[in-house]
């Protein structure tokens, strides 16, 4: 069975390099696409799903924003199994920080030019205080197109979704983007 995998916002698949997949799975990593100017989330999801063969059963695995994406793809091309890592199952699990972005619509009004290489480096530096075990953050963060980053943050803040019972959620107990206190994951990873 094929397992389609989508990593986190702006990340390539090095971020998932420690995962070991069963040999019976044919793992297919899907790269992020750059959104077109003014593109709706639904249209973007359709374009991401175009790369997938749904003529036979398949699974979906998404990390962080990739977890949101695979749940949306499942509406278009239903999967046998869906696993999300470090992600949320519904908009009810958004952190307060993300909810503030949703309510105020601040992400929509942020200028694109704040999503620069320097701001990515600053984020990486600050994140090390919260996640000292992850010194390779900038190695993973390879999609740095300012429009893509701004668009993605807007879509995360705007995302509305009712929980899908077939989604298996795995969260770290110290996740800073999607804190565990707002979710009831199926599995918890310590540290």
How does the language model describe each region?
Residues 59-60, 82:
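Conserved alpha/beta-hydrolase fold motif
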Residues 18, 72-73:
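Active-site signature of alpha/beta-hydrolase-fold catalytic machinery across serine-
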Residues 30-32, 171, 182-191:
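Short glycine-rich catalytic loops that host catalytic nucleophiles or stabilize transition states
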Residues 169-171, 175:
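Short beta-strand/loop motif that positions the catalytic acidic residue
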Residues 131-164:
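Hydrophobic, aromatic-rich cap/lid helix
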Residues 78-113, 149:
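Flexible "cap/lid" loop of the alpha/beta hydrolase fold
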Residues 61-70:
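Gly/Ala-rich beta-loop-alpha elbow adjacent to hydrolase catalytic centers
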Residues 1-56, 90, 106-112:
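Active-site catalytic motif of lipid deacylating hydrolases and related acyltransferases
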């Amino acid at each position: 069975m094929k397992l389609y995998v989508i990593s986190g916002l702006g990340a390539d698949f090095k971020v998932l390099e420690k995962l070991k997949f069963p040999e019976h799975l044919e793992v297919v990593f899907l790269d992020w696409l750059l959104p077109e100017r003014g593109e709706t989330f639904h249209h973007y999801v359709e374009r991401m799903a175009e790369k997938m063969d749904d003529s036979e059963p398949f699974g979906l695995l998404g990390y962080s924003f990739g977890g949101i994406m695979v749940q949306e793809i499942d509406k278009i091309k239903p999967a046998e199994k869906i696993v999300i890592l470090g992600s949320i199952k519904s908009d009810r699990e958004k952190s307060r920080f993300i909810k503030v972005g949703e309510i105020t619509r601040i992400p929509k009004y942020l200028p694109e030019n704040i999503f620069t290489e320097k701001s990515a480096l600053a984020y990486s530096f600050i994140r090390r205080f919260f996640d000292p075990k992850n010194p390779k953050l900038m190695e993973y963060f390879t999609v740095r197109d300012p429009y893509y980053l701004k668009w993605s943050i807007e879509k995360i803040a705007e995302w509305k979704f009712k929980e899908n019972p077939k989604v298996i959620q795995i969260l770290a107990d110290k996740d800073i983007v999607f804190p565990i206190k707002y979710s009831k994951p199926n599995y918890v990873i310590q540290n």
